[in-house]
Amino acid sequence: MTRRLLIAACILTLCVPALALAQPAAARLTILHTNDTHGHLMPFSYPAIAPAGSALEQMTERSNIGGMARRAALAQKIRTEQKGRGIPVWLVDVGDFCDGTPFSTEYKGEADMAAINAAGYDFATFGNHEFNNTLEQVRKLLGQATHPILLANAVDRATQKPLGQAWRVEKVGGVRVGLFGMVTREAATYPAAKEGVDILDEIKTATVTVQTLRKQADIVILLSHGGEDMDKRLAAEVPGIDVIIGGHSHTRLPVGEFVWRGDDLKQNDINGTVIAQAFQWGGELGRLDLLFEKDASGVWRVSRYRERLLPITQDMQAEPMVAAVVDRFWQPIAARFGEVVGKAAADFSSRGDDEAPYNLVADAVRETYNVEFEMENTGGVRAPLVAGDITRADLVTLDPFDNRVILFKATGTQIKDLLARYAPYVSGLRYRLVDGQVVEATIGGRPIENDRTYAGATNSYYAGLALRDISQENTGRMRLDVLTGYVKDKGTVTPAYDGRRVVIGQRRRDGR
């Protein structure tokens, strides 16, 4: 008996190292990601000819792309394929699903959230445009989500507690993966934040959160609605972030980016941060395949990655349940927003500094109110127009904000200062800006006189930003209504590429 026990003990002793060796030395994870979808629940098209050097020019498919139901079907297909290989798949969104189409303007994010839920998203964060609602509506959207909303740096002003979930840890094979989410500090200027939300500094919040996560996670992933520049800063300045899935800057990163950290490159340690971002509107689905391995010291690292942007094309099947959700929200508004209000003689797109959609809006307001000039902020016009019929939905997608027309009078000196500070899009005015200095400016074909007062117009957002010291009159009329009336009256509108705005050197951004 004693001999049998001894033999058994020896066998167990021999087996223990073998079992330890059998523990997984690697794990894989696939992350499917979207950002800045801005209400594009249905398929859409870009202009046929893309601006030279633009992200659009890189895209292989630009016509009849995207749509939440197709996206969900593609994600489901990839989940099934990866499940057969034993690889988990996460579907994540990095915010700004609001503000962009009639779905957003009519349902304040609820149609988007219902579709996101139906598509089976696993995690998400909010962007600044989700805060372009009331605080009550933001809380409602948080409550409607069937997946965790990660928001470490958006806290209730009264309680200083995160609006969503600050962070969480998930198990992927034998690897503990920590996740957290953040929104750009620009969100602090939006209505919901002004009501009662503090948007904390991204670098400080990330530093504290990563320190907390590193005590209980092997890998750290950030869902960052902060833009490409901020993501690079976070990667460089906050040790311990392995992956950043980004948004906000509408950057198209076909193979991702990598920010190196340090010079001591070890085997199985890429020693830095992977950054991914999938442009905008859900025309493509980002796919990031990650391999986790232990380094020589037994620490889990991201040892390999592969990032791709998968086109969502018209030949793809739609997921029926998601399609039904989208249709449920579309049908009540289809007749109104499907109405054809005019025609575009050609694509309204970009050619250098000439932005035909901005020129259309600026011309519409200036001509309607018979003022000498009009100004529009960068970021205030959100989409091109494709040649052919123009529907109300097209104009809402171009101008999705609740902006009112503002009339004001300004001296030539004040106008030149506005041009230098904000490089706005214009009508009735032509100018040339070099390294932030106005070198040429005319109104009505004549040089601007510094002491003369001119009658102008703009939108309420830009007025609040730039015209604080200039008296102004709010007409109360929505810019979108002015634009719609203008297109109806014209019948057919033609894009203007006339060199009215030339900006050389540093560009000043003031938009959303």
Whereabouts are the PLM-identified features?
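Feature captures C-terminal
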Residues: 27-30, 40, 50, 146-153, ...
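Acidic, metal/ion-coordinating pockets
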Residues: 22-314, 321, 352-364, 405, ...
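Flexible, glycine/charged-enriched surface loops at secondary-structure junctions
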Residues: 88, 220-223, 336-342, 372-378, ...
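Bacterial N-terminal signal peptides
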Residues: 8-18
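Hard-cation-handling environments
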Residues: 298-390
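Alpha-helix initiation and N-capping motif
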Residues: 135, 318-330, 334-337, 341, ...
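Short, compositionally biased low-complexity segments
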Residues: 37-47, 303, 331-342, 389-393, ...
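Bacterial N-terminal signal peptides that target proteins for export
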Residues: 1-8
